[in-house]
Amino acid sequence: MAKAYWVVCYKSIKNPEKFAAYGKLAAPAIQAAGGRFLVRAAAPAKTYEGGLNQRTVVTEFDSVAKAIAAHDSAGYQEALRVLGDSVERDLRIVEGLS
């Protein structure tokens, strides 16, 4: 079974306090669901080909099903409720190569 990854790029953070509160709830919820943070970068080391200088987070899961379950878990949904509209971001779940 191929691993899966959350790839999250933050276009803007409008409310740093809400973002910090989200992080305090999201990290344990993600880890409880089996997520392993691989990248938590405030900015890329270098961008190419029109790349944007955006905060990026990559989290590994054992499968797509587990990645989706983590997103849909009660703990992560509570973190999203706290986050509200304080950020503009793109979160996608991608399957790794098997």
Annotate each predicted stretch with a short phrase.
Residues 1-56, 61-72, 95-98:
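Short S/T/G/P-rich N-terminal loop/turn motif that feeds into the first structured element of a domain
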Residues 67-92:
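C-terminal structural segments of small proteins and small subunits
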